[in-house]
């Protein structure tokens, strides 16, 4: 009998990288369906643009690096990055913004560092932040919910707005938004920030009706369900999502208790913006998050605290992307001080 000699590691995980990526993308479906239902088919168009750009950009870089195309493109990591960007960017934003964000995420934030497993920062969030800093007006121009528009945006209208900037009837996104009053056209976090600047607090919380915020609430519920599925399937651990949400809620609760005029209530933080998407799908990236159990708890808590701080006092209404990237910077330090001590060593 022949015995094969192999080196460590000897542990075995039945799930391949491709299988993990597919499960994460499937878990995003409830949130994607909610966003599409409330904000229109523009998200699907942006998703197609992002996927094509990600595959082309990754293929070009892999060819230049003389890496195998089939196995690298087939692992699903590029498509997951594209999906996260499509879920994060405004659904009716210009097509070139999605192309720029996706190409930057794949080429600069991922492949420049050596590809999957070597990037220190979450590629999707790097692409998002590049656009947010470079084009803040376009990045904060989310369309209102379909139910609030006098002229609901069809698939044809969405394609025209994304590729030409106007609908077949000659309406721009700004004109479509103008048909909705100033409260309902903003996201919940946008509305809160605007109210702080204009002195319209604290009555904002009572005037914000369910109809205006239903899309964001259901989207977050969808991502929460998808995240619980990933925990059940043991694709991700519970440490980062739970510590992130707990730290954010503790900060928001204390802030709202001490200064309700300048701090949003905890439930607004929990079910607005990219809270659940960030907690279960972005912060849990195994490449850029902490490696140890204690480290994951610290990493998640740090991210959640930063989300609350940026949302409350920062210049942008949602701080998930910046919080994740800032926490990514701290990962080497967290891993250094949370590594388990080897037996026999002090």
From Swiss-Prot:
Stated family: Belongs to the NqrB/RnfD family.
First-level EC class: translocase
Chain positions found as FMN phosphoryl threonine: 187
Record InterPro entries: NqrB/RnfD, RnfD_bac
Function: Part of a membrane-bound complex that couples electron transfer with translocation of ions across the membrane.
Necessary cofactors: FMN
UniProt-annotated location(s): Cell inner membrane
Keyword tRNA-binding: no
Lineage of the species this protein comes from: Bacteria, Pseudomonadati, Pseudomonadota, Gammaproteobacteria, Enterobacterales
Swiss-Prot/TrEMBL keywords: Cell inner membrane, Cell membrane, Electron transport, Flavoprotein, FMN, Membrane, Phosphoprotein, Translocase, Transmembrane, Transmembrane helix, Transport
Official protein name in the record: Ion-translocating oxidoreductase complex subunit D
Keyword Heme appears in the UniProt entry: no
GO BP annotation list: electron transport chain; transmembrane transport
Transmembrane segment boundaries: 20-40, 42-62, 69-91, 120-140, 212-232, 242-262, 264-284, 290-310, 314-334
Assembly information from the UniProt record: The complex is composed of six subunits: RnfA, RnfB, RnfC, RnfD, RnfE and RnfG.
A Gene Ontology term for the protein's cellular component: plasma membrane
Membrane topology, record value: Multi-pass membrane protein
EC number: 7.-.-.-
Superkingdom of this protein's organism: Bacteria
């Amino acid at each position: 009998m022949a015995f094969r000699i192999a080196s460590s590691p000897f542990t075995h995980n039945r799930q391949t990288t491709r299988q993990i990526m597919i499960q994460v993308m499937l878990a995003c479906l409830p949130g994607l369906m909610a966003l599409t239902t409330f904000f229109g088919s523009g998200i699907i168009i942006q998703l197609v643009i992002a996927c094509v750009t990600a595959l082309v950009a990754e293929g070009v870089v892999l060819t230049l690096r003389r890496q195998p195309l089939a196995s690298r493109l087939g692992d699903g990591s590029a498509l997951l990055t594209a999906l996260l960007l499509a879920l994060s960017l405004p659904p009716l934003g210009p097509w070139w913004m999605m192309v720029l964000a996706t190409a930057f995420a794949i080429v600069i934030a991922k492949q420049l560092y050596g590809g999957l497993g070597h990037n220190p920062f979450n590629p999707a969030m790097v692409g998002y932040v590049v656009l947010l800093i470079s084009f803040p007006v376009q990045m904060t121009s989310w369309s209102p919910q379909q139910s609030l528009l006098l002229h609901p945006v069809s698939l044809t209208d969405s394609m025209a707005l994304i590729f030409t900037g106007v609908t077949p009837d000659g309406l721009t996104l700004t004109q479509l938004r103008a048909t909705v009053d100033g409260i309902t056209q903003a996201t919940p976090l946008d509305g809160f920030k605007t109210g702080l600047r204009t002195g319209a607090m604290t009555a904002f919380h009572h005037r914000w009706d369910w109809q205006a915020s239903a899309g964001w609430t259901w989207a977050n519920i969808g991502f929460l369900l998808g995240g619980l599925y990933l925990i059940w399937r043991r694709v991700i651990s519970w440490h980062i999502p739970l510590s992130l949400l707990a730290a954010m809620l503790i900060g928001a609760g204390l802030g709202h208790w001490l200064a309700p005029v300048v701090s949003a209530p905890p439930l607004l933080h929990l079910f607005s913006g990219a809270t659940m998407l960030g907690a279960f799908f972005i912060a849990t990236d195994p490449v850029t998050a902490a490696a140890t159990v204690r480290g994951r708890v610290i990493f998640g808590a740090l991210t959640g605290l930063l989300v609350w701080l940026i949302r409350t006092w920062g210049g942008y209404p949602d701080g998930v992307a910046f919080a994740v990237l800032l926490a990514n910077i701290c990962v080497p330090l967290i891993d250094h001080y949370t590594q388990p001590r080897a037996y026999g060593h002090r």
